[in-house]
């Protein structure tokens, strides 16, 4: 199931009425977001194909032939759900991302913001990442409760992810943030901005959120060559801001197929989403790479209709089960309730049947599955070797797969070890064999260390502790992992 969220451009109400806003106009109160936020070094991720070795020590030699392969969906999940939020909306951060990752959530109920001219004025209040860091939050913010996700089939949490579109050519993505803890005379600093800034993009990407092109600043949006040119301009800005990271997805804006035509000719864009003229995604039929394929999505504002679609696809025979592909312009309290409902029914607090990644992560996994290979061999009576080959394409950042190995059970295993190409590893029984989750991200240990360090700065922050445990939990067993866990306790 794919969900997409889209945004409408707004008047910039950020600064409000300067005469009434005494706190926060001083430049000393502002943070330049791009100077503050850590980002996983995507630009220095593994280059070139990956060949990973897994070594399984067993009690006795297997009595049946061993077979290995990658399932259609990661973690052997039977249901695919994808969420894409268009137009670079601020709510992607302070609502969608926040709700998934156990952070305070921006309340969409209007809050009193009276002025002399408008004593009954109300407004929805939002926050930025700089506000969250400093504890400067709207007065009606919804408190952090829990994280939302599923498991990897071995008991480890895998939080939901989604895609946000970027407006990379817009200057407002570089906007400063007015941070003023304790100031309550007015709340202009929490009024909705034009969109996300790069600070929020970086923080969300650290948690698995994907990015996509959307509108570009072409004068003629019906000119393929001009749109291609602006893809390049936007891509350069993205690389500059995101440590060399590129964007490989397009969410078609405004029903304009010229963007699709331009994307087909623009090398970096590999996966697309559209409301029409695309292909429905049937994950259990996908035998090709889906490269340069525009996947159909739909916009649905009635949450009950989305629930009905999820129920219908969950009941459908596997081969006929579609990914539910939904677009939405803005997320509010009702959308947060929908995410919680998905978690409670199909996630880790339900039947644990859903895989909820970003579209680009799904695209990569399907590419690895259809173009990579797994070789299994018994090197001696007590050792089985798995060799996993992953072909790395341009702009690939999620080298992580599930491998099923039949003919062997967890109870038969003495130990599982891997070579240095593997940074994360977990396994468990699955059907008539075992499943192994193999992560080959180059900087996964450094990434986990960052979140441990964030927790060490404030050990009273329960959400930061949950983050530290979550990211350290991704690592394969090692002395380094043990040392990081000891720092959290």
Could you say what each language-model-derived stretch is?
Residues 4-46:
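Bacterial Sec-dependent N-terminal signal peptides
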Residues 46-203, 207, 237, 246-247, ...:
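Active-site beta->alpha N-cap acidic-glycine motif
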Residues 57-58, 64-65, 107-118, 269-284, ...:
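C-terminal domain-boundary segment and adjacent tail
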Residues 87-91, 168-173, 211, 215-221, ...:
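Solvent-exposed loop/turn segments at secondary-structure junctions
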Residues 145-151, 161, 209-210, 215-219, ...:
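CE4/NodB-like, metal-dependent polysaccharide N-deacetylase domain
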Residues 217-299, 334:
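Catalytic domains of cell-wall/extracellular-matrix polysaccharide-remodeling enzymes
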Residues 394, 425-447:
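C-terminal beta-strand-rich structural cap/linker in extracellular carbohydrate-active enzymes
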Residues 443-489:
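Beta-rich interaction/scaffold domains
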């Amino acid at each position: 199931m794919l969900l997409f969220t889209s945004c409408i451009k707004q008047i910039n109400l950020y600064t409000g009425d300067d005469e009434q806003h005494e706190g926060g106009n001083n430049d000393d109160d502002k943070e330049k977001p791009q100077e503050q936020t850590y980002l996983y070094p995507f630009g220095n991720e593994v280059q070139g194909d990956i060949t990973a070795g897994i070594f399984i020590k067993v009690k006795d030699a297997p009595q049946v032939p061993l077979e290995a392969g990658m399932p259609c969906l990661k973690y052997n999940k039977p249901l695919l759900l994808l969420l894409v939020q268009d137009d670079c909306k601020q709510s992607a951060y302070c609502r969608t991302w926040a709700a998934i990752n156990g952070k305070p959530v921006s309340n969409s109920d209007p809050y009193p913001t009276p002025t002399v001219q408008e004593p009954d004025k109300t407004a929805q209040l939002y926050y930025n990442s700089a506000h969250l860091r400093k504890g400067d939050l709207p007065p009606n913010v919804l408190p952090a409760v829990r994280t939302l996700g599923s498991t990897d089939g071995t008991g480890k949490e895998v939080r939901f992810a989604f895609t946000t579109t970027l407006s990379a050519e817009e200057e407002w993505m570089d906007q400063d943030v007015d941070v003023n803890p304790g100031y309550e005379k007015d709340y202009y600093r929490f009024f909705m901005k034009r969109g996300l800034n790069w600070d929020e993009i970086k923080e969300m990407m650290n948690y698995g959120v994907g990015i996509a092109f959307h509108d570009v600043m072409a004068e003629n949006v019906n000119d393929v060559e001009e749109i291609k040119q602006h893809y390049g301009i936007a891509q350069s800005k993205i690389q500059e801001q995101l440590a060399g990271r590129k964007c490989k997805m397009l969410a078609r804006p405004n029903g304009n197929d010229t963007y699709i035509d331009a994307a087909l000719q623009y090398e970096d864009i590999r996966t697309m989403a559209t409301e029409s003229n695309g292909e429905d995604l049937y994950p259990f039929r996908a035998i090709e790479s889906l490269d340069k394929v525009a996947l159909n999505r739909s916009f649905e504002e009635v949450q009950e209709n989305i629930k009905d679609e999820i129920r219908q696809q969950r009941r459908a025979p596997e081969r006929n089960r579609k990914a539910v592909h939904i677009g939405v312009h803005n997320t509010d309290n009702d959308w947060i309730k929908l995410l919680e409902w998905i978690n409670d029914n199909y996630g880790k607090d339900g039947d644990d049947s859903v895989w909820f990644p970003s579209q680009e992560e799904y695209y990569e996994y399907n590419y690895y599955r259809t173009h990579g290979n797994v070789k299994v061999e018994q090197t001696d009576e007590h050792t089985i070797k798995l060799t996993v080959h992953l072909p790395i394409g341009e702009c690939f950042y999620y080298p992580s797969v599930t491998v099923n190995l039949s003919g062997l059970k967890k109870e038969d295993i003495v130990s599982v070890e891997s070579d240095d190409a593997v940074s994360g590893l977990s396994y468990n029984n699955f059907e008539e064999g075992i499943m192994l989750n193999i992560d080959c991200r180059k900087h996964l240990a450094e990434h986990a260390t960052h979140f441990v360090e964030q927790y060490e700065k404030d050990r009273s922050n329960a959400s930061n502790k949950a983050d530290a445990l979550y990211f350290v939990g991704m690592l394969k067993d090692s002395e380094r992992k043990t040392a990081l866990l000891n720092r959290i306790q």
